[in-house]
């Protein structure tokens, strides 16, 4: 399959789409990749039904990636709900597995390469490597195994990562961070090789994440909104008050060490409680825009806004034409 060129020899900044395209979702029939069902429907209709939903999801990802390419979007986070209930403990894992989709995932990987899509995942926040609960840890590892295996079966390169948060602190942040690192080291290589860690607004600051990275050499995703929210919620955490600009080179180094193209997240406060995302984003911060020229590294910025691709297209005027 021919690859369509969309890369640049000079450092660049690209904007990434998260999971859903609002234009395609509103079509009739809708195009989206998170068809699912409740557990009762799974038990009533059986595994062939959820396999059919999964194949519809995969087929629509083809359309979504083509749309991305045609509109200059080359960074794409996939939904974690492509395969309904595949990590549900009630599922018979000898009957319903990713092996049912070997050909479909191989073809999906070819399509991703054709349209120059950097593929990633952001497994849900119930994935907690620092948990003291053995059962929760076992389920987390299985969830991460499924995500990593999808990327492997697609033939994705090392730039296709899985972003997770630190999780809870369980009454003792230092002990949890040590446990997090210990559990990370015990992960199978195919999971470790794709896992990256993002700061959050409640438990793990950017400084906390960088400490973990120093211990286990995991790339760190800087989320500007989580960073701002953490500062508001933890005014007594002196380290958290450090300027975000001062963190940029330290974060970039975590990616440089691993040879992976950096990923950052961009969002703004919306209506509601602290941490809610806005529909659109007013501007790309200068500390993001200057990364390619200042540090000589290409970078991808995931746009976490409710209006998805429309928010990306609106931000285009703030970037040089070479970025898309």
Language-model segments: what does each one mean?
Residues 228-232:
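Short active-site loop/helix that positions an aromatic residue
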Residues 144-216, 225:
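Eukaryote-skewed repeat-based solenoidal scaffolds used as protein-protein interaction platforms
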Residues 122, 223, 301:
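Conserved, mostly hydrophobic/aromatic
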Residues 118-127, 159-165:
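Glycine-rich, often proline-containing surface loops adjacent to acidic residues and nearby aromatics
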Residues 1-118, 127-141, 145-156, 186, ...:
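Alpha/beta catalytic barrel-like cores
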């Amino acid at each position: 399959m021919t690859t369509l060129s969309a890369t640049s020899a000079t450092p660049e900044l690209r904007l990434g789409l998260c999971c859903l395209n609002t234009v395609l979702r509103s079509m009739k029939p809708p195009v989206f990749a998170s068809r699912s069902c409740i557990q009762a429907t799974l038990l009533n209709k059986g595994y062939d039904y959820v396999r059919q939903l999964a194949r519809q999801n995969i087929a629509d990802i083809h359309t979504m990636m083509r749309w991305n390419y045609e509109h200059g979007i080359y960074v794409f986070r996939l939904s974690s709900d492509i395969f309904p209930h595949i990590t549900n403990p009630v599922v018979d894992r000898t009957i319903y597995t990713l092996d049912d989709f070997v050909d479909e995932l191989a073809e999906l990987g070819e399509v991703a390469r054709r349209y120059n899509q950097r593929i990633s995942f952001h497994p849900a926040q119930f994935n907690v490597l620092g948990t003291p609960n053995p059962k929760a840890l076992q389920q987390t590892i299985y969830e991460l195994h499924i995500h990593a295996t999808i990327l492997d079966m697609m033939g994705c390169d090392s730039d296709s990562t899985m972003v997770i948060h630190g999780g809870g602190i369980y009454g003792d942040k230092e002990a949890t961070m040590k446990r997090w690192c210990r559990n990370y080291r015990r992960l199978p290589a195919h999971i470790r090789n794709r896992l990256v860690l993002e700061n959050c607004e409640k438990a793990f600051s950017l400084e906390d994440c960088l400490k973990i990275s120093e211990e286990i050499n995991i790339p760190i995703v800087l989320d500007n909104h989580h960073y701002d929210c953490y500062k508001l919620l933890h005014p007594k955490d002196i380290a958290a008050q450090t300027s975000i600009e001062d963190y940029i080179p330290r974060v970039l180094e975590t990616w440089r060490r691993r040879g992976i193209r950096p990923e950052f997240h961009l969002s703004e406060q919306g209506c509601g409680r602290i941490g809610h995302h806005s529909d659109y984003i007013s501007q790309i911060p200068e500390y993001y825009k200057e990364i390619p020229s200042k540090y000589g590294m290409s970078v991808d910025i995931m746009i976490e806004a409710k209006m998805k691709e429309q928010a990306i297209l609106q931000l285009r005027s703030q970037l040089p034409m070479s970025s898309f």
